[in-house]
Amino acid sequence: MRILITGVTGFIGGHLAERLNGAGWAVRGLARAPEHAAALAAQDIEIVQGSLLDRGSLASCMYACDAVIHAGAWTGTPGVPEDEAWTTNVAATGWLLEAARQARISRFVYLSSVAAYGVNRAPVIDETARTPLVGQLYPDSKIAAETLVRGAGEQGLATTIVRPASTYGPRGGAWTIGPIEQIKAGSLVLLGKDEGLVNTGYIDNFVNGVLLALSSPAAVGETFNICDGVTTTYRDFYMRYAAMLGKASLPTVPAFLARGAATSPGRWLRRLMGKQPPGPWSVHFRFNPSRFSIDKASRLLGYTPSISLDEAMRRTEAWLRDAGYLAAGETG
């Protein structure tokens, strides 16, 4: 069985490629810059050059494949024009779906995001919750792409949508290396008590869930939240990284200042705080009161996260130390 993975040079895509390769799949990874996939190529993973912005390369790279995991996306990288970001996340998904239909692909798994739930603040959010447009590029693009995936499913393509949450672990960017580097630079601040909830998704748990979604007949036509199914506070999550760096505390700003500085009229507050605060979308998540339910994935796929937060952080710290992000004198 041969599978195409987009976004293979990314955190999630790379881990999926390695796991599927180890499970006996013939893995083909789409990479805009193949040199960034040298470690995967060294494991006999086929790397083909192409871009989500190049419709022709998306069709050609699907030759002789049986399945697709679409993990590639614009995830908020600054400096990318809005039309390019939208094309990457939405139009390219449509092109991939069309190419998959033409190639008679047997399974198509799309990695979306819990950001599709928008500003829903219910205590527990499952897959039946509405996904309204919120006027923010990233979540709105994920909602639009999901609509295309469902449409392709109605036309006969065996599709599944997976919504990850805060996925972290070895090689992770936004939820692993990012916080470590921000803490080192003194730019990561706690917002008041920072008791908003992080819906963690340790990478090995998440990959297990995606593989179940890929292989289970019960997943066809369905949408799943895939994360650890438990929460911790932002304060606890970030303080675990701080402890790895030998820090007992982090800079804190009052919550009301953070909320105000995230608004357009809050420029004076940004100067007062002396730091670049999170934007409105980030602030929403920092004060998030919700847990994303994985009951559906458990019921239909048999998904059970096996690695606890404590064990996941232990493994993550070991990788950070081996990779040189934690100095020899820093102790966790």
Kindly give the residue locations of the regions a language model identified.
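N-terminal Rossmann NAD(P)H-binding glycine-rich loop of SDR-like oxidoreductase domains
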Residues: 3-23
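NAD(P)H-binding glycine-rich loop region in Rossmannoid oxidoreductase-like domains
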Residues: 36-41, 45-88, 99, 117
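C-terminal amphipathic/interface module of NAD(P)-dependent oxidoreductases
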Residues: 50, 232, 240, 276-332
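Catalytic helix-loop patch of NAD(P)-dependent Rossmann-fold dehydrogenases
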Residues: 87, 91, 121-167, 188-192
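Conserved Rossmann-fold NAD(P)-dependent oxidoreductase catalytic core, especially the SDR/UDP-sugar
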Residues: 95-137
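Substrate-positioning beta->alpha
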Residues: 144-145, 173-178, 192-214, 221-225
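Glycine-rich Rossmann NAD(P)(H)-binding loop
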Residues: 169, 191-196, 224-231, 242-246, ...
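Mid/C-terminal beta-alpha module of Rossmann-like enzyme folds, strongest
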Residues: 212-277, 294, 314-317, 327-330
